From Swiss-Prot:
This is Tumor necrosis factor receptor superfamily member 5. The lineage of its organism: Eukaryota, Metazoa, Chordata, Craniata, Vertebrata. GO terms for cellular component: CD40 receptor complex; external side of plasma membrane. It comes from Equus caballus (Horse). PANTHER family: TUMOR NECROSIS FACTOR RECEPTOR SUPERFAMILY MEMBER 5. Monomer and homodimer. Interacts with TRAF1, TRAF2, TRAF3, TRAF5 and TRAF6. Interacts with TRAF6 and MAP3K8; the interaction is required for ERK activation. It is a single-pass type I membrane protein. Residues 216-280 are cytoplasmic.
Length: 280
């Protein structure tokens, strides 16, 4: 084995080229551009030009309706989210240069997905089911079956199951048991039913008779007033014939009338006429 002199080894080391290692680690808010660590653009601004050995990173603000919410080296800003009313959305928060706009669903609707790009109506709970958890803007209604002793007879996204009516607490008897869709039916006992129905029936009949009597009385009042008015306008007229008195008398009848409560006798030889009624 040939041994090289120590001097050759030393010269070999000196002649070996030494290449400087490039810097690859930059600070948290920097990025590597070529051989330089450049500063990232702050939220609300986008990158225009990278830094150089003599210039800093050049950034510009986002335009109207745009935003960037992180430190970045983006050349374009993001557009604000559009809350489309045709999809059931409305604006919850207006976007800025550093935050996006937020949307929520109209009342009675919730987001169809986690991204909330559209809304759908809350699901109602069918009869026999009650609401366990109300729907929110991001979640649908949660329903549960009505347990024994409870019922729900409507389709609703708001109502819970209702308890059956307690007939005992009302002093009644249960005529029909409740189900998960119908309430219990209560009623009177046979004797109690008679005690309640008879007074009610008598009261109704009495009211009908009283009303009928009042109607008749009111209907007769105009007739009575008209009759009294007609009698008051006429003067009493009385005709007296000669045959009513004994003794001789002339052949021609003598007519006597009462006029103003004074007797008036027709003269002999004049034609007998019935007096004309005079009115005051």
């Amino acid at each position: 084995m040939v041994r090289l002199p120590l001097q050759c080894l030393l010269w070999g080391c000196l002649l070996t080229p030494v290449h400087p290692e490039q810097a690859t680690a930059c600070k948290g808010n920097q990025y590597l551009s070529g051989s330089h660590c450049c500063d990232l653009c702050p939220p609300g601004k986008k990158l225009v030009n990278d830094c150089t050995g003599i210039t800093e990173t050049e950034c510009s603000p986002c335009g109207a309706g745009e935003f960037l919410d992180t430190w970045n080296r983006e050349s374009r800003c993001h557009q604000h989210k559009y809350c489309d009313p045709n999809l059931g959305l409305q604006v919850q928060g207006t976007g800025t240069s550093t935050t996006d706009a937020t949307c929520i669903c109209h009342e009675g609707q919730h987001c169809s997905s986690d991204a909330c790009e559209s809304c759908i109506l809350h699901s109602p709970c069918a009869p026999g089911l009650g609401v366990k958890q109300l729907a929110t803007g991001v979640s649908d209604t949660v329903c549960e079956p009505c347990p024994v002793g409870f019922f729900s007879k409507v389709s609703s996204a708001l109502e819970k199951c209702h308890p059956w009516t307690s007939c005992d607490t009302k002093g009644l008897v249960e005529l029909q048991a409740g189900t998960n869709k119908t309430d219990a039916v209560c009623g009177f006992r046979n004797r109690m039913r008679a005690l309640v129905v008879i007074p009610i029936t008598m009261g109704v009949l009495f009211a009908v008779l009283l009303l009928s009597a009042c109607i008749r009385k009111v209907a007769k009042e105009p007739e009575n007033k008209a009759l009294h008015r007609k009698v008051g306008w006429q003067d009493p007229v009385e005709t007296v014939y000669p045959d009513d008195f004994p003794g001789p008398h002339s052949i021609a009848p003598v007519q006597e009338t009462l006029h103003g409560c004074q007797p008036v006798t027709q003269e002999d030889g004049k034609e007998s006429r019935i007096s004309v009624q005079e009115r005051q």
